[in-house]
Structure formats: C-alpha cells, structure tokens
C-alpha cells in the first residue's frame, strides 16, 4: 500500500497525465500539446475554432452517440481518431421503455392515486 495519498502505487511510475479542464472559450489554450480530448458539449463549435492549436491531438472521444455536429473537413482529413458513446445507453433506454409500457398497460397512474 501507499504511505500517503500522494504516493504513487508500485509499478505505476510510467503513468502520468496532464489533465486540463476548460469551457469552450478556453479550449484553444487547453488543447495545445494535448494528445486526447474528451468532449461533453457536442453541439459546440469550439473544436473547429481551436483546430489550429491542436498540434498533437490524436484522439477525440465524444460522450454522445452521434458525431455529426463535431465533424468538419479539417478533422475528417486528419489522422485524429474520433470515438463516441454509441451503445452505452441501449440497455437503460430499453429498460425504461419496457417499464413505461408495463406501467401504461397496468394503468399504474390510477393505481397510485
């Protein structure tokens, strides 16, 4: 075990990360030198606007199922890998729909009153 919370566990000496968090207006500065980008706001044009500063970018992961709003010509023509969260919501969404169908079929709204 580690002596204190700041000690690195044994065998992980080679793992280091420079984590940067920013809003859309700070992406141009934050993406400079970054190798990966995790994108939450998939409707934002921030990646397109900051593209010239993305000098080492290798991977963009978008936390949505679609990537249509992210894609632009320069990104398509680059070697940057784009991944998404396709399939992550399949099971929870199916479970919700099934529950809603059962609740409707059993007239649950009146049953709870």
Model-inferred region functions:
Residues 1-81:
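An N-terminal-biased, well-structured beta-alpha scaffold segment characteristic
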Residues 79-113:
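Phosphate-binding beta-alpha-beta segment of Rossmann-like dinucleotide-binding domains, i.e.
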